[in-house]
Amino acid sequence: AIDVVVISTPYHHHALASGAAMRAGKHVYCEKPLAHTVYEARLLQDVYNELRPGIATQMGTQIHATENYRRVVELVQGGAVGPVSEVHVWCSRTIPTVEVAILPEQPEPDSFHWDVWLGPAAARSYNEQYFQGGNLNWNRRWDFGNGVLGDMGSHLIDLPFWALDLRRPLTVESVGPEVDPVACPPWQVVTWEHAPRNGNPNLATPVKVVWYHGPEGMRQRSDLLQPLVGEDTKIDDWGIGAAFLGEKGVVVADYGKYVLSPAAQ
């Protein structure tokens, strides 16, 4: 008998596979991101709420289990930098240009089931350049992925969501280059506004979460954050990270380390 389904496919399969597994009464471990779109994620939440508590689920954000993330959560929730009003999160990765929307047909190998790989995506002829090179290739395309934010944001934004007990935002604003119907943006700055949370006084303030990726995103991040973190932290040395801006100081963290500014903290 099958008890658990592990889903580590390209992102456009995640919601369909997870939903089908839960409907079949199976527990689900799904790699990040949970879904291809926000709409799909909400559908999965509805399915889970209908079937709970008989189904156990987990998303593959393995860094959530590390000592460093747990320690940063303790510092923030314990008031080391005071109430936090802003968190700035970033990844220096960008999205290379997708020059051809629909690639020319190639012979499909006998060992490759192209229709299965396409799954719920729009039909097209086989071409290995759609997937060759792994997720850094197919994740460029809206049909199969959701770009740097969908890929890396799942890991990095997990930290402020956990530390600040965040839920669905009140507002969302995205700034970037002109929208490309085929390819995800090479750079992006996204702002979410969150309401205050009840309970812990260190969480009882509205929070703005800002995401940056790509060259222009990194420039805006550095211009804003370097004066705030001071000489204790050279923000350009952090290719990925999150900076919690509190009333009493700043904590900057990535997967494996954190620093407090001012250092006297």
Language model regions located:
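Contiguous beta-strand/loop segments that form the cofactor/metal-binding neighborhood of enzyme cores
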Residues: 70-71, 83, 88-92, 97-265
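Beta-strand-loop-alpha-helix segment that lines the small-molecule cofactor/substrate pocket
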Residues: 10-11, 15-64, 79
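N-terminal Rossmann-like NAD(P) cofactor-binding module of classical short-chain dehydrogenase/reductase
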Residues: 3-6
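Structured segments of extracytoplasmic/periplasmic soluble domains
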Residues: 8, 44-47, 75-78, 90, ...
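N-terminal Rossmann-like dinucleotide-binding module
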Residues: 1, 63-66, 76, 160
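Active-site-proximal beta-strand/loop segments in catalytic clefts of secreted hydrolases
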Residues: 8-9, 31-33, 60-62, 90-92, ...
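Alpha-helical packing segments of well-folded alpha/beta enzyme cores
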Residues: 17, 40, 68, 156-159
